């Protein structure tokens, strides 16, 4: 998977290995080189040997939870702690269009042609150079422009128990294909 920091600057990555028929999967017992497809979508980026763009997750056994298991976990641990947990084929996460109080910012839209980003210097840049704030309107909605890149806050605040891990699915075919999973950011708020 792309690292969250890679996804937040809209760089799409996919792992490739010899003999595999799928991206981002390495079969058990594999020995050989790994290759990485790197596709910057919004910002031009500088990459060097050793730049960390992807993360590998090792899994063993069943890796998904059923809805009943998620409901039990939410009942016992409180996964969603600021509202109702919408569990149906996984935990649904929705966009927060209420803003954060004073300024009503609901997210950020990437600026095109804002300049190079050196992926080895993540704290070097000001937010305002690369991002425009997105505000909600009087009807509590926003209009998303096709082909643009946005980072929007979720309505739900979640807590993942230490005994579990969470991962966003790449898309839900019932609502469309969105890259919701590749810039996931959990904060401690």
Residue map of PLM features:
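DUTPase catalytic domain/fold
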Residues: 1-189
């Amino acid at each position: 998977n792309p690292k969250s920091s890679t996804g937040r600057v809209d760089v799409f990555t996919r792992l490739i290995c010899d003999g595999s028929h799928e991206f981002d999967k390495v079969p058990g017992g594999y020995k050989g080189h790994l290759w990485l497809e790197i596709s910057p979508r919004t910002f031009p980026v500088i990459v060097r040997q050793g730049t960390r763009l992807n993360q590998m997750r090792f899994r063993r056994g069943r890796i998904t939870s059923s809805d009943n298991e998620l409901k039990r976990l939410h009942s016992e641990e409180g996964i969603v702690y600021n509202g109702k947990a919408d569990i149906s084929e996984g935990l649904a996460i929705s966009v927060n269009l209420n803003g954060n109080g004073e300024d009503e910012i609901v997210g950020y839209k990437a600026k095109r042609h804002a300049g190079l980003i050196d992926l080895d210097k993540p704290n070097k840049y000001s937010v305002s150079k690369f991002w425009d704030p997105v505000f909600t309107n009087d009807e509590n909605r926003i209009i998303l422009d096709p082909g643009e890149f946005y980072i929007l806050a979720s309505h739900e605040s979640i807590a993942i128990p230490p005994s579990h891990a969470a991962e966003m699915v790449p898309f839900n075919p019932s609502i469309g294909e969105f890259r919701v999973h590749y810039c996931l950011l959990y904060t401690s708020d």
